[in-house]
């Protein structure tokens, strides 16, 4: 574990953006602090929101600063996650068994052929009873497969380039390797090829792509529901992908998103009782995927040093009850529909650090649906089309040392989340607020409240860092349970009115800034009445 976290990655900020932001900051610092009489109001969605009770009276005090001081977070050591280390993860001494067998007899393939007339899809694609290539009872590499599988199902079309025209299943006892001897493995879109692993799979120094034989090119995204080949690993599996390029995989179908690491479906998991899947994806590139990365009930997975570019829905999307994840040093950009990086629904005790997430359709980084105990540190989040970092209904998280710059809406947005610690973050040149905290009643929305409960409460501690040149102001927090501020550098927004604190902070702005800026003390803002008391 690293006791001293550093942020030594190069920052390829657009030159004009940095020049403008730094010049503006210098001018603002020279201007000193000016207090505004007319605070700006940030935009906030109003549809489907119940009117919540607003506390009318807050106390402003200056607590001791000692409890607010915190050591830098200890981040995982990444030095062991290398291609060389991955190559040592599997045993190659026992040759495995290769067969071509019916899909419907295999637990690992039931998701794709059972119910809803799914079988018919594969009958049409294969023009017969659906079959798959099976690997079991030992080690097999792609060249072994080519030697034993009929050429109509798997063939070499040019030196080192192979086309698979059936699904490939790595069974629980199987070990499958694709390495540098393979220049490219093409999974046929028309024939319905894909890869599923219940065992061990190692993919290094190669390319694996979804391929349209009809168009003689990548199976480029056209519509959400058009089948595109994918890679999926199930419960108990171990997967390592390193120095590999993957493109044009996945579509809008369960477990078929692109590269997915998932526990079995609940009913199957109860029967098989296999552990959570795990593994690494490192130093690789993913483009035009439905999801660049997805996981479900996965443990200790490492996503490090990858490029996720121009993917469709999400770049990186760990989901339901995954934990102990490391998402580090990735470059995520150009996501077309939603967020660059999102963890959602009880994704806990994980690390998101030293990533770049930029130019995504919505937010750069999102913590969502009761994801707690996470550390988000030293990330560079810029030029996203909504917020930089967004926390939805996810308390007890630490954001440390992030640079959140030139996002179109808020720099950091915190909704219905308590005990959020914001330490040493820079939010600069964002379209609305530098930091925006608010509550929202979700009962009248399409949210499943039993599955994803929430409390309409927000509280945060903000220590150090800088909020400067944000379009609507440095900071706005509506109806908080509490707010603590200390050593926060707040420079003027782009508007000429000077510093303007919004929400309840604006009502006591003079007192807050006197303590925080002039006296350099900590500030604690507490409501006299709690939400419970107000409702009663």
UniProtKB/Swiss-Prot annotation:
This entry's Gene Ontology molecular function terms read: isomerase activity
**Key words of the record:** Alginate biosynthesis, Isomerase, Periplasm, Repeat, Signal
Q: Does the keyword Isomerase apply?
A: yes
Instruction: Give, from the UniProt record, the effect of changing residue 320 to A.
Output: Loss of epimerase activity
Per UniProt, what does mutating residue 294 to A do? Answer: Retains 24% of epimerase activity
Q: What is the effect of changing residue 345 to A/Q?
A: Retains 10% of epimerase activity
Q: What is the effect of changing residue 296 to A?
A: Retains 66% of epimerase activity
Query: What pathway annotation does it carry?
Result: Glycan biosynthesis; alginate biosynthesis
| Any GO BP | alginic acid biosynthetic process
For this record, an example GO cellular component is: periplasmic space
Highest rank taxon of the organism: Bacteria
Chief localization: periplasm
Catalytic activity, as annotated = [(1->4)-beta-D-mannuronosyl](n) = [alginate](n)
Q: Where in the cell is it found?
A: Periplasm
**Signal sequence segment:** 1-36
Q: Which SMART domains match?
A: CASH, PbH1
The PbH1 repeats extend over 298-320, 322-345, 347-369, 371-393, 394-416
Q: What is the effect of changing residue 415 to C?
A: Loss of epimerase activity
The residue ranges crossing the membrane are: none
Q: Which family, according to UniProt?
A: Belongs to the D-mannuronate C5-epimerase family.
Q: Which function does this protein serve? A: Catalyzes the epimerization of beta-D-mannuronate to alpha-L-guluronate during the synthesis of the linear polysaccharide alginate. In addition, is part of a periplasmic protein complex that protects alginate from degradation by AlgL by channeling the newly formed alginate polymer through a scaffold that transfers the alginate polymer through the periplasmic space to the outer membrane secretin AlgE.
Q: What is this protein called?
A: Mannuronan C5-epimerase
Species name = Pseudomonas syringae pv. tomato (strain ATCC BAA-871 / DC3000)
From the broadest rank down, the organism's phylogenetic lineage runs: Bacteria, Pseudomonadati, Pseudomonadota, Gammaproteobacteria, Pseudomonadales
Question: Which gene does this sequence derive from?
Answer: algG
């Amino acid at each position: 574990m690293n006791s001293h976290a550093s942020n030594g990655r190069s920052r390829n900020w657009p030159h004009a953006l940095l020049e403008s932001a730094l010049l503006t900051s210098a001018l603002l610092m020279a201007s000193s602090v000016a207090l505004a009489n007319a605070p700006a109001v940030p935009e906030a969605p109003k549809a489907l929101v119940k009117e919540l009770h607003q506390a009318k009276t807050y106390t402003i005090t200056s607590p001791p600063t000692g409890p607010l001081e915190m050591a830098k977070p200890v981040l995982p050591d990444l030095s062991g996650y290398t291609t060389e280390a991955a190559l040592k993860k599997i045993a190659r001494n026992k040759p495995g068994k290769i067969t071509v067998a019916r899909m419907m007899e295999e637990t690992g393939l039931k998701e794709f052929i059972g119910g809803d007339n799914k079988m018919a899809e594969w009958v049409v694609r294969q023009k017969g009873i659906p079959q798959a290539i099976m690997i079991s009872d030992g080690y097999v590499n792609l060249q072994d497969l080519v030697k034993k599988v009929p050429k109509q199902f798997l063939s070499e079309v040019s030196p080192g380039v192979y086309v698979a025209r059936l699904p490939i299943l790595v069974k629980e006892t199987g070990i499958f390797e694709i390495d540098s001897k393979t220049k490219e493995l093409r999974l046929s879109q028309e024939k319905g090829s894909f890869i599923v692993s219940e065992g061990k799979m190692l993919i290094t120094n190669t390319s694996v792509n979804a391929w349209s034989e009809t168009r003689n090119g990548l199976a480029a995204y056209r519509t959400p529901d058009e089948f595109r080949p994918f890679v999926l690993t199930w419960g108990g599996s171990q997967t390592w992908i390193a120095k590999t390029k993957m493109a044009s995989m996945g579509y809008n179908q369960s477990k078929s998103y692109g590269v997915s690491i998932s526990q079995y479906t609940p009913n199957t998991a109860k029967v098989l009782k296999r552990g959570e899947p795990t593994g690494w994806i490192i130093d690789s590139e993913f483009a035009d995927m439905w999801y660049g990365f997805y996981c479900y009930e996965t443990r200790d997975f490492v996503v490090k040093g990858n490029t996720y570019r121009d993917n469709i829905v999400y770049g990186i999307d760990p989901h339901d009850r995954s934990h102990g994840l490391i998402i580090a040093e990735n470059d995520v950009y150009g996501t077309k529909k939603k967020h660059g990086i999102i963890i959602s629904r009880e994704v806990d005790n994980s690390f998101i650090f030293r990533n770049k997430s930029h130019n995504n359709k919505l937010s750069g980084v999102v913590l969502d649906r009761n994801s707690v105990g996470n550390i988000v540190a030293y990330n560079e989040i810029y030029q996203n089309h909504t917020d930089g970092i967004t926390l939805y209904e996810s308390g007890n998280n630490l954001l440390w040392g992030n640079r959140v710059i030139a996002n179109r809406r808020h720099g950091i947005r915190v909704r219905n989340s308590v005990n959020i610690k914001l330490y040493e973050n820079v939010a600069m040149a964002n379209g609305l607020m530098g930091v925006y905290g608010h509550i929202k009643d979700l009962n009248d929305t399409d949210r499943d409240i039993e599955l994803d409960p929430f409390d309409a409460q927000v509280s945060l501690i903000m220590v150090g860092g800088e909020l400067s040149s944000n379009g609507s102001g440095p900071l706005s927090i509506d109806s908080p349970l509490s707010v603590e501020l200390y050593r926060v550098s707040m420079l003027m927004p782009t508007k000429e009115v000077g510093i303007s604190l919004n929400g309840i902070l604006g009502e006591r702005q003079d007192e807050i800034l006197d303590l925080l800026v002039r006296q350099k003390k900590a500030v604690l803002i507490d409501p006299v009445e709690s939400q419970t008391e107000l409702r009663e």
